[in-house]
Swiss-Prot record:
Its main location: cytoplasm. It comes from Fusobacterium nucleatum subsp. nucleatum (strain ATCC 25586 / DSM 15643 / BCRC 10681 / CIP 101130 / JCM 8532 / KCTC 2640 / LMG 13131 / VPI 4355). It comes from the Bacteria. Keywords: ATP-binding, Cytoplasm, DNA damage, DNA recombination, DNA repair, DNA-binding, Nucleotide-binding, SOS response. This is Protein RecA. The keyword Ligase does not apply. PANTHER family: MITOCHONDRIAL DNA REPAIR PROTEIN RECA HOMOLOG-RELATED, RECA. The gene is recA. Can catalyze the hydrolysis of ATP in the presence of single-stranded DNA, the ATP-dependent uptake of single-stranded DNA by duplex DNA, and the ATP-dependent hybridization of homologous single-stranded DNAs. It interacts with LexA causing its activation and leading to its autocatalytic cleavage. ATP binds at G80, A81, E82, S83, S84, G85, K86, T87. GO terms for biological process: DNA recombination; DNA repair; SOS response. GO terms for cellular component: cytoplasm.
Amino acid sequence: MAAKKDKSVPDSKITDKEGKEKAVKDAMAAITKGFGSGLIMKLGEKSSMNVESIPTGSINLDIALGIGGVPKGRIIEIYGAESSGKTTLALHVIAEAQKQGGTVAFIDAEHALDPVYAKALGVDIDELLISQPDYGEQALEIADTLVRSGAIDLIVIDSVAALVPKAEIDGEMSDQQMGLQARLMSKGLRKLTGNLNKYKTTMIFINQIREKIGVTYGPTTTTTGGKALKFYSSVRMEVKKMGTVKQGDDPIGSEVIVKVTKNKVAPPFKEAAFEILYGKGISKVGEIIDAAVAKDVIVKAGSWFSFRDQSIGQGKEKVRAELEINPELLAQVEKDLKEAIAKGPVDKKKKKSKKEASSDDTDDENLEIDDAIDENND
């Protein structure tokens, strides 16, 4: 007896446009039904999954993530080079989670948390749960116990590289124990993933990068802890320091760019740039200035900045200082910026100056003269 034919499978390649569109929609619907939402989407589509989120403290990064922050009940990886701003970003997420009324735990495997800096970034250190485990298995067991309590909204583990397996700590320095940390992470994440989703607890892993030895083609760096974290993470963010923020000749912060290298809840590969000021964290005012200039809310002419036809300073640092001491002006800029964002993208066509317009008029006159000469010659 012949096998029953699946009517949803075409006999040959579909060539007409309407047929292709319908077939793609049907296939995407089947994938979503069979495997869950978020596994397939059009890269350029603006729609995202209806997922609750925790803001990151950066307006630009919240936009890049597509849902207004990091998703709840998921695993997040923040990775990058040393002193790139990974922990600072995680501390801002902690502060935002606490503002929402959430309970947060910080598992400090590196034993390097600075409570003074955390407080300066807005973290309520009196309410922050902190653990400094002795080895990797202990750290993940503590995390799992906290998740299963059903009372924790966010757990941050700093860092994956410091989650050293007990066997490695108890062993000799000369012992060759390959893949212990990778196996530890794989086993721990398998156990954690289901509970995180069940209790809507977000877990952020801070990770470091390492150079690949003997690589000629492809990426020259990788993250620690094996491949399990890459697989189980719903969102992965790479943090890079791009430059230094200066006030005169004095460095006062870092220019940072974050690339969303993986995103299961919205289209990935978006980037966000912002400034991290020493001792203060992410500069919200700096982000507002950049966004306002991009939307023509604040007009930049050379080094001068103006708002509503009134000069507000020369140089970005002076504008930042002016907005910080003048909350009413900052509120007006924010209001106009929100209205500009709601209107959609700014027309990128360059506005012609009087000189350019005059030049265009001259060119038109020359063309008319040339046309007249050609007609006479004919």
